[in-house]
Amino acid sequence: MQIFVKTLTGKTITLEVEPSDTIENVKAKIQDKEGIPPDQQRLIFAGKQLEDGRTLSDYNIQKESTLHLVLRLRGGAKKRKKKNYSTPKKIKHKRKKVKLAVLKYYKVDENGKIHRLRRECPGENCGAGVFMAAHEDRHYCGKCNLTFVFSKPEEK
């Protein structure tokens, strides 16, 4: 029986085959006519790629059917290298949770009276509970940048 093979260039080749012929035999006949090696050939019929071990009758290829020949693509995506870091990644700082941390701001004396150890910021932007940092020579509010500097008597 006669089948047609349409190449990528649009040229149609006529082949004389039998329904019992394998796809490998068809590819060998295409190599004889066109010079394309069988390992680079891909034959498509009815939207399916034809496998080498099967016969034309397995795919229901009848007389005057048209197969489409496309070339196999070599290679693929370029292999990417895994990044190697010379220095280890910096560990993100985790804030330490201290239970009952508010107790360090207050002190209870022997009479049961509560005294503040830190000064609250009197600024309008800062509400109640915003304490000023106690430095050696000043109190400083980190929220509104208010600073109270202590004046020490000069030693003579």
From Swiss-Prot:
Q: Where is this site: Essential for function?
A: H68
Q: Where is this cross-link: Glycyl lysine isopeptide (Gly-Lys) (interchain with K-? in acceptor proteins)?
A: G76
The alphabetical list of record keywords is: Cytoplasm, Isopeptide bond, Metal-binding, Nucleus, Ribonucleoprotein, Ribosomal protein, Ubl conjugation, Zinc, Zinc-finger
GO biological process annotation, one example: ribosomal small subunit biogenesis
Among the GO molecular function terms of this UniProt record, one is: protein tag activity
Q: Where is this cross-link: Glycyl lysine isopeptide (Lys-Gly) (interchain with G-Cter in ubiquitin)?
A: K48
**What's the miscellaneous note?**
In Drosophila ubiquitin is encoded by 3 different genes. RpL40 and RpS27A genes code for a single copy of ubiquitin fused to the ribosomal proteins eL40 and eS31, respectively. Ubi-p63E gene codes for a polyubiquitin precursor with exact head to tail repeats.
What family does the database annotate?
In the N-terminal section; belongs to the ubiquitin family.
What cellular-component terms does GO give this entry?
cytoplasm; cytosol; cytosolic ribosome; cytosolic small ribosomal subunit; nucleolus; nucleoplasm; nucleus; small-subunit processome
Ubiquitin-like domain boundaries: 1-76
Which stretches does the record call C4-type zinc fingers? 121-144
Q: Could you tell me what this protein is called?
A: Ubiquitin-ribosomal protein eS31 fusion protein
What are the residue positions of the site described as Interacts with activating enzyme?
Answer: R54, R72
Q: Superkingdom of this entry's organism?
A: Eukaryota
